[in-house]
Amino acid sequence: METVRELTPVLAEPEEAAERVTEVLPGEPIRLIETRDGWAEIRTAYDYPGWIKAGAIGGKPHGEWLENRFPDPVTYARTLLGTSYLWGGMTEAGIDCSGLVHMSFRATGRLVPRDADQQEDAGTPVDEGDARVGDLVTYGDGGSAGHIAFWLGAGRILHSTQRDGTDGVVEETEPPELAGIRRLIFRL
C-alpha cells in the first residue's frame, strides 16, 4: 500500500480539468494500479477508482491513519460549522454531506464508508421516536440515500448542504423529505 504526502484530489480522468471524485488525506492507504505521463491510477481505501498526480505519492507509511481525537462524531462535526460545501470534499477547505459523516467518525477512531448510500447501508434502521443524537438521517427517493445528516434531536440536523441558499455545514430544522434514520453500531 502507498499513501500521499498531502491532501490530494482524486480525479475521474488523468487531466487537470477532470471531475473531482473524492480526496485522499495524508496517511490514507491507496492502491497504485499504474503510472502514466505523470499521473497515477489508484483505488482509495474506500474503493474509489481515480487518478492523482504521481508526484503526490509518498510520505510516511499509512500505519495507523485513523484518528481518535473526539469523544463522538457530532462534537467533531460541530467544529466544521460554516465550512463551505464541496462535492467530494473531506476537509476544512470544503466538505460534502457524506464527507462530513465520514470524517466525523474518523475523528473518533472509527471508519465508516465514504458515500451516503454506503453509510445508509451500514446502519441499522431506527424509528424517529427512538433516534439518538448522532444517528444518521437519510434523504432521497428510489431506495438509496442521496443526502445524509446527523440527527441532533427535536427535529434538528447537522449536515453539509448546498440547498435553498444554504452553503456548507449547518445545524437546521430537518427538511420534510426525511427517508429514514440509521444507527451505526460498532463492535469492539
Spans of features found by a protein language model:
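Boundary regions of SH3-family modules and the immediately adjacent low-complexity/disordered segments
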Residues: 1, 15, 29, 36-37, ...
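Short, basic/aromatic beta-hairpin or loop at an interaction surface
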Residues: 1-11, 103-118, 152-153
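Aromatic- and glycine-rich peptidoglycan recognition patches
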Residues: 2, 68, 152-188
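Beta-loop motif signature
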Residues: 3-32, 85
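Structural motif
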Residues: 28, 134-135
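Catalytic cysteine-centered active-site loop
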Residues: 85-133
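Catalytic nucleophile-His microenvironment captured as a short glycine-rich beta-strand/loop
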Residues: 136, 145-156
